[in-house]
Amino acid sequence: MPTPNAASPQAKGFRRAVSELDAKQAEAIMSPRFVGRRQSLIQDARKEREKAEAAASSSESAEAAAWLERDGEAVLTLLFALPPTRPPALTRAIKVFETFEAHLHHLETRPAQPLRAGSPPLECFVRCEVPGPVVPALLSALRRVAEDVRAAGESKVLWFPRKVSELDKCHHLVTKFDPDLDLDHPGFSDQAYRQRRKLIAEIAFQYKQGDPIPHVEYTAEETATWKEVYSTLRGLYPTHACREHLEAFELLERFCGYREDRIPQLEDVSRFLKERTGFQLRPAAGLLSARDFLASLAFRVFQCTQYIRHASSPMHSPEPECCHELLGHVPMLADRTFAQFSQDIGLASLGVSDEEIEKLSTLYWFTVEFGLCKQNGEVKAYGAGLLSSYGELLHSLSEEPEIRAFDPDAAAVQPYQDQTYQPVYFVSESFSDAKDKLRSYASRIQRPFSVKFDPYTLAIDVLDSPHAIRHALDGVQDEMQALAHALNAIS
């Protein structure tokens, strides 16, 4: 049952907490600029789904779009039923293909399954090639002589990367809250900031998977912005951040150059994460499409921006930037259980429909970005959107928002707030519990295969046949034998 956030001793009224800050911090947190619209993966996923639905408003146009076009010729794969008629329906169907000058590559008939009284006795499978413009007319004519005409291409699997090197293709930026495009962006009127952003973004555009991430020489103003964000948030972490974040943050300060007067370099941080959990960073020029971003997680690759928020708005950014990535995401990705949780979301996204991408993006929003967890009888923050935003971190653990137990089915369809602070947060019993619930949710997503990440080849194994599954089981058996040997050695 939803409850107000009364689980933490530090919970208090949000406005009371803000009133205890100095005037500058309070103004920054409550200003319209701070609570302005934020970008998220959900917006992009929703746009992609709506675009797909618009394209599918006509069933025939949707079918035509699904078929492969080659030099103006449409390659069709069709299934249809043949009713018992005079003249035979097969003869009439072949006549349709002749009329539209189709080149038949394959034609096969088989008894309909299951055969019921009154149902057509035969099904027909046809693969053919016809001029693209005549596809709608051919379908219309075929439906007059056959039943249940459908295209096998309608259930085609969308492309997704199979090898880590193919992440070079996963760099599609969405229309974003950009200093060049949006009047409300704090950097819109700052030409120097806009040019700086373009210069840093070029690193991401030129990057190839496996290359060292080029260093950025940050300016004095950028470092000053980092210092204000770093020192302000660091003072709040001991009472508001989860244990895993605190432990990783201490290690990052000891071994990775995290400090007030220096912005960490992505290459150094990436090497640290690789040793801890196998995650790596990859430079990104801005907010990526939801499908591309989630696919990267499947390979334990986190697409990470290098530019920093504008100096006039240090307490908040409406888009991904390095304070959000380095202070919010990176410490959590250094935890093994949370890293696995993040990868599981990515694996669940591979090859699924736009509708499922939107749901997974919403799940990501309410967990990885704005998630809460229980620890030692208190509620703590683990979401990067909370841990990189002073005002939202205060708000999330105050008495104002509604706190609900984490349920992936509910979180995946929960309306989110991008105009101000979240009115609803989901709290997990533990990361392990959240991981188990996510895997249960992902197992119900409809796709004609399963996937498995191979950490040796950094590739995705598609489990779509008995042979592929047997091959995967061989690897599991090898690991089990090694563990059994280890148990024998210590017993």
Curated annotation (Swiss-Prot):
<feature type="modified residue" description="Phosphoserine; by CaMK2">
    <location>
        <position position="19"/>
    </location>
</feature>
<dbReference type="InterPro" id="IPR019774">
    <property type="entry name" value="Aromatic-AA_hydroxylase_C"/>
</dbReference>
<comment type="similarity">
    <text>Belongs to the biopterin-dependent aromatic amino acid hydroxylase family.</text>
</comment>
<dbReference type="InterPro" id="IPR041903">
    <property type="entry name" value="Eu_TyrOH_cat"/>
</dbReference>
<feature type="site" description="Important for substrate specificity">
    <location>
        <position position="418"/>
    </location>
</feature>
<keyword id="KW-0966">Cell projection</keyword>
<comment type="pathway">
    <text>Catecholamine biosynthesis; dopamine biosynthesis; dopamine from L-tyrosine: step 1/2.</text>
</comment>
<dbReference type="InterPro" id="IPR005962">
    <property type="entry name" value="Tyr_3_mOase"/>
</dbReference>
<dbReference type="InterPro" id="IPR036329">
    <property type="entry name" value="Aro-AA_hydroxylase_C_sf"/>
</dbReference>
<dbReference type="GO" id="GO:0008021">
    <property type="term" value="C:synaptic vesicle"/>
</dbReference>
<keyword id="KW-0597">Phosphoprotein</keyword>
<protein>
    <recommendedName>
        <fullName>Tyrosine 3-monooxygenase</fullName>
        <ecNumber>1.14.16.2</ecNumber>
    </recommendedName>
</protein>
<feature type="modified residue" description="Phosphoserine">
    <location>
        <position position="31"/>
    </location>
</feature>
<dbReference type="InterPro" id="IPR045865">
    <property type="entry name" value="ACT-like_dom_sf"/>
</dbReference>
<dbReference type="Pfam" id="PF12549">
    <property type="entry name" value="TOH_N"/>
</dbReference>
<dbReference type="GO" id="GO:0043204">
    <property type="term" value="C:perikaryon"/>
</dbReference>
<dbReference type="GO" id="GO:0007507">
    <property type="term" value="P:heart development"/>
</dbReference>
<keyword id="KW-0560">Oxidoreductase</keyword>
<feature type="binding site">
    <location>
        <position position="369"/>
    </location>
    <ligand>
        <name>Fe cation</name>
    </ligand>
</feature>
<dbReference type="InterPro" id="IPR021164">
    <property type="entry name" value="Tyrosine_hydroxylase_CS"/>
</dbReference>
<dbReference type="GO" id="GO:0004511">
    <property type="term" value="F:tyrosine 3-monooxygenase activity"/>
</dbReference>
<dbReference type="GO" id="GO:0045471">
    <property type="term" value="P:response to ethanol"/>
</dbReference>
<keyword id="KW-0968">Cytoplasmic vesicle</keyword>
<keyword id="KW-0963">Cytoplasm</keyword>
<dbReference type="GO" id="GO:0005634">
    <property type="term" value="C:nucleus"/>
</dbReference>
<feature type="binding site">
    <location>
        <position position="329"/>
    </location>
    <ligand>
        <name>Fe cation</name>
    </ligand>
</feature>
<feature type="modified residue" description="Phosphoserine">
    <location>
        <position position="465"/>
    </location>
</feature>
<dbReference type="InterPro" id="IPR019773">
    <property type="entry name" value="Tyrosine_3-monooxygenase-like"/>
</dbReference>
<keyword id="KW-0503">Monooxygenase</keyword>
<keyword id="KW-0530">Neurotransmitter biosynthesis</keyword>
<dbReference type="InterPro" id="IPR001273">
    <property type="entry name" value="ArAA_hydroxylase"/>
</dbReference>
<dbReference type="Pfam" id="PF00351">
    <property type="entry name" value="Biopterin_H"/>
</dbReference>
<dbReference type="GO" id="GO:1990384">
    <property type="term" value="P:hyaloid vascular plexus regression"/>
</dbReference>
<keyword id="KW-0539">Nucleus</keyword>
<dbReference type="GO" id="GO:0030424">
    <property type="term" value="C:axon"/>
</dbReference>
<dbReference type="InterPro" id="IPR036951">
    <property type="entry name" value="ArAA_hydroxylase_sf"/>
</dbReference>
<keyword id="KW-0479">Metal-binding</keyword>
<dbReference type="Pfam" id="PF21417">
    <property type="entry name" value="TH_ACT"/>
</dbReference>
<keyword id="KW-0127">Catecholamine biosynthesis</keyword>
<feature type="binding site">
    <location>
        <position position="324"/>
    </location>
    <ligand>
        <name>Fe cation</name>
    </ligand>
</feature>
<dbReference type="GO" id="GO:0006585">
    <property type="term" value="P:dopamine biosynthetic process from tyrosine"/>
</dbReference>
<dbReference type="GO" id="GO:0005737">
    <property type="term" value="C:cytoplasm"/>
</dbReference>
